[in-house]
């Protein structure tokens, strides 16, 4: 009995350890090559209380439908190669890859020799220009919807497809490729509904908000009209209490001034214009993580995106189980393993195939559902930090005392024991920790600008030797011609002065 109990306990502990090691960390796998979704971020809805000032409105709007449409995707690229030939067989080549936007029949392979290409008194060379055109034609399925963006593609961004292009049966995408399909005319049905909306009373213009649309609309005489929606609210003033008028003699001078200014300040804050400007300004410039804000605002944890002029550009992702790998390279994002492949987990929880570089020895505190601490180039996996917010209710005096609990000790290490110091110096006055909140950030710390480790991929000794010998032969030939030109006049003068050689 005791043996069986110990076996069960050991087996359960092993299962828990394996499950914790395998499924403890999750990342977002996102296809950003697909068409993103566009959504208007109505920040003013933050000021609306769903249970107060509720009114009934008649709403007339167009329904949205989505259908699948077969199409043919054509992508053509033209490879331009120009090869130069000079003395002693030395050559160089220029390679350019351009998008070809013409017809498939016009995508021809040809070569045009130019001989001589360039020739002057010290150098001659010829050139051959070769253009190779390649096209890939693929049968695909796209989704057509009655609201913009009108077309969704999983293989490219089809946001630029217009209604006219849908009706014509051909569209050119932003990357230069083309789509051909059966012409399609967008049609929408009109829907009439009675919805409960929340009206904002403390505003110069009455604003009604609907949770079904996640939008707010400014009412003019109780109605709002546009090409896609009509809103009519009859009793839009019944739920708003009238403002009380007070006179100067009722209060003191200071109180009267505050009383007169309070409605203006209240309108400014409750209209959320200031809050909207701050939020869109911060998240629209890339200073902070727009994906985190979009997840909280749209109440969807599995999306990424950014904000452009108050419009959220959003991609749908799905969660996958990943595991940390040994951080043995100079990468800013930690390496993770997913299905046997190496990826990098950025600060927004997204799996990437590339990453900015970072200084070896840089310590990073990261949040992936839990706090983790990792060191760049340490060869060790990031470790979890045990942190409980409820146990950190510090009094200020206790908090200050907890910062320096031991005397400062300087551990000096020379270049022989610490190669990082040999490469970068001690860097004692710089912040060793860092965090990044931008999807494109390469900043690796406060006050420290990262320039990256040198890359030695350009080292090619055999190529250098070939070029050196070629130029040495060319220079030797030129010097021989110069010496010949200098010696010939002297030889002719000597022959004229001494005559022919006779025995």
Curated annotation (Swiss-Prot):
Glycans are attached at residues 63, 109, 139, 192, 196, 202, 221, 230, 235, 321, 328, 388, 438. The chain crosses the membrane at residues 468-488. It comes from the Viruses. Glycosated; Stabilizes it. A portion of p57 is cleaved into p27 and p29. p27 and p29 are called gp43 when glycosylated, as they seem to have the same molecular weight. Coiled coil: none annotated. One of its GO terms (cellular component) is host cell plasma membrane. Residues 489-503 are cytoplasmic. GO terms for biological process: clathrin-dependent endocytosis of virus by host cell; fusion of virus membrane with host endosome membrane; virion attachment to host cell. Keywords: Clathrin-mediated endocytosis of virus by host, Cleavage on pair of basic residues, Fusion of virus membrane with host endosomal membrane, Fusion of virus membrane with host membrane, Glycoprotein, Host cell membrane, Host endoplasmic reticulum, Host membrane, Host-virus interaction, Membrane, Signal, Transmembrane, Transmembrane helix, Viral attachment to host cell, Viral envelope protein, Viral penetration into host cytoplasm, Virion, Virus endocytosis by host, Virus entry into host cell. Residues 23-467 are extracellular. Residues 274-315 are annotated as: Fusion peptide. Residues 1-22 form the signal peptide. The record marks 249-250 as: Cleavage. Unprocessed envelope protein p57 is thought to be involved in attachment of the virus to its cell surface receptor. This attachment induces virion internalization predominantly through clathrin-dependent endocytosis. Envelope protein p27 and p29 presumably linked by disulfide bond are the viral type II fusion protein, involved in pH-dependent fusion within early endosomes after internalization of the virion by endocytosis. This is Envelope glycoprotein p57.
């Amino acid at each position: 009995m005791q043996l069986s109990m110990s076996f069960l306990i050991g087996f359960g502990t092993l299962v828990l350890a394996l499950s914790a090691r395998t499924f403890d960390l999750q990342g977002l796998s996102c296809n950003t090559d697909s068409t993103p979704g566009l959504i208007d971020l109505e920040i003013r809805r933050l000021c609306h209380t769903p249970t107060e000032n509720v009114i009934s409105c008649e709403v007339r709007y167009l329904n949205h439908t989505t259908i699948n449409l077969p199409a043919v995707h054509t992508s053509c690229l033209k490879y331009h190669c120009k090869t130069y030939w000079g003395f002693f067989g030395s050559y160089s080549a220029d390679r350019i890859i351009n998008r070809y936007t013409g017809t498939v029949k016009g995508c021809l392979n040809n070569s045009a020799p130019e001989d001589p290409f360039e020739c002057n008194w010290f150098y001659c060379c010829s050139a051959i220009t070769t253009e190779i055109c390649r096209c890939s034609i693929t049968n695909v399925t796209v989704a057509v919807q009655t609201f913009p963006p009108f077309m969704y593609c999983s293989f490219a961004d089809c946001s630029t497809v217009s209604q006219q292009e849908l009706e014509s049966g051909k569209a050119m995408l932003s990357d230069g490729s083309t789509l051909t399909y059966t012409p399609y005319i967008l049609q929408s049905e009109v829907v009439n509904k009675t919805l409960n909306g929340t009206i904002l009373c403390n505003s110069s213009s009455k604003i009604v908000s609907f949770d079904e649309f996640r939008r707010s609309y400014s009412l003019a005489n109780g109605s709002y009209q546009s090409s896609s929606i009509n809103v009519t609210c009859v009793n839009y003033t019944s739920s708003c209490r009238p403002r009380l008028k007070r006179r100067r003699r009722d209060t003191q001078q200071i109180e009267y001034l505050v009383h007169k200014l309070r409605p203006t300040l209240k309108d400014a804050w409750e209209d959320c214009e200031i809050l909207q400007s701050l939020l869109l300004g911060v998240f629209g410039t890339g200073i902070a993580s727009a994906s985190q804000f979009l997840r909280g605002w749209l109440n969807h944890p599995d999306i990424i995106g950014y904000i452009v002029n108050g419009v959220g550009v959003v991609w749908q992702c799905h969660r996958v189980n990943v595991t940390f790998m040994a951080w043995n390279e100079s990468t800013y994002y930690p390496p993770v393993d997913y299905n046997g492949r190496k990826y990098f987990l950025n600060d927004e929880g997204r799996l990437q195939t590339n990453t900015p570089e970072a200084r070896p020895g840089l310590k990073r505190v990261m949040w992936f559902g839990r706090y983790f601490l990792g060191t760049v180039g340490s060869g060790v996996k990031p470790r979890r930090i045990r942190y409980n917010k409820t146990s950190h209710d510090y009094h200020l005096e206790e908090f200050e005392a907890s910062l320096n609990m031991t005397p400062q000790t300087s551990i000096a290490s020379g270049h022989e024991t610490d190669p990082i110091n040999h490469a970068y110096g001690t860097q004692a006055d710089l912040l060793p920790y860092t965090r990044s909140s931008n999807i494109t950030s390469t900043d690796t710390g406060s006050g420290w600008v990262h320039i990256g480790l040198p890359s030695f991929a350009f080292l090619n000794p055999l190529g250098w030797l070939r070029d050196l010998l070629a130029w040495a032969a060319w220079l030797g030939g030129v010097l021989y011609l110069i010496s010949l030109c200098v010696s010939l006049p002297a030889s002719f003068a000597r022959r004229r002065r001494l005559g022919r050689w006779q025995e």
